């Protein structure tokens, strides 16, 4: 079974913020396929669905971002999901808006949600999709920036990025060759 995790913070006030882009991609996929996160366990909202014949566990942690591993680790254990079948979607300050970067593995890169998942899984050897949100300009602090909603102009780009990221997730589900998925989806989204 594949496991797709989108990172974000729970609550209405965080919807459409930069830090919640992982949730936005999960929500896009669920809506597209008429699925919903209809179960809760281990601090996570989740569903198990069939997509293109494959069983898929979709998770949105119901913790704050920095505690995401408290939901992901126990749910993966409960459903016996192997770490090589996991992909995590999250915001990345080091990529400009409009870019996504798929990786086979890697460090948390300063992202506290990823730090928590790595801690709870005991490894950083899992796939991820880093979704560029850019860095703050005009002296805004990083916490204020990532918790700020996208502007209408930014959402024009981010809607394309969300769709592109969702296609990358679907390709991951269908393919046994993640290197091919990376080659197809890495880069600037137009």
UniProtKB/Swiss-Prot annotation:
TRNA binds at residues 14, 64, 66, 112. GO terms for biological process: protein quality control for misfolded or incompletely synthesized proteins; rescue of stalled ribosome. PROSITE patterns: PEPT_TRNA_HYDROL_1 (PS01195), PEPT_TRNA_HYDROL_2 (PS01196). One of its GO terms (molecular function) is tRNA binding. The active site is at 19 (proton acceptor). Its EC number is 3.1.1.29. The record marks 9 as: Discriminates between blocked and unblocked aminoacyl-tRNA. Belongs to the PTH family. This is Peptidyl-tRNA hydrolase. It comes from Staphylococcus haemolyticus (strain JCSC1435).
């Amino acid at each position: 079974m594949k496991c797709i995790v989108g990172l974000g913070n729970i609550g209405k006030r965080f919807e459409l913020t930069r830090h919640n882009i992982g949730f936005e991609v999960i929500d896009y996929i669920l809506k597209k396929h008429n699925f919903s996160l209809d179960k809760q366990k281990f601090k996570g909202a989740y569903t198990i669905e069939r997509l293109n014949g494959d069983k898929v566990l979709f998770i949105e942690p119901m913790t704050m971002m920095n505690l995401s591993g408290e939901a992901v680790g126990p749910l993966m254990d409960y459903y016996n999901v192997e770490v090589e079948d996991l992909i995590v979607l999250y915001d990345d300050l080091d990529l400009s808006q409009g870019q996504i970067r798929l990786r086979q593995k890697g460090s948390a890169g300063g992202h506290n949600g990823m730090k928590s998942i790595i801690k709870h899984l005991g490894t950083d050897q899992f796939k991820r999709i880093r979704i560029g949100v850019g860095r703050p300009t005009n002296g805004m602090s990083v916490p204020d920036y990532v918790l700020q909603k996208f502007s209408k102009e930014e959402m024009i780009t981010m809607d394309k990025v969300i769709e592109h990221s969702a296609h990358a997730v679907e390709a991951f589900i269908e393919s046994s060759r993640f290197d091919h998925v990376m080659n197809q989806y890495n880069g600037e989204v137009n």
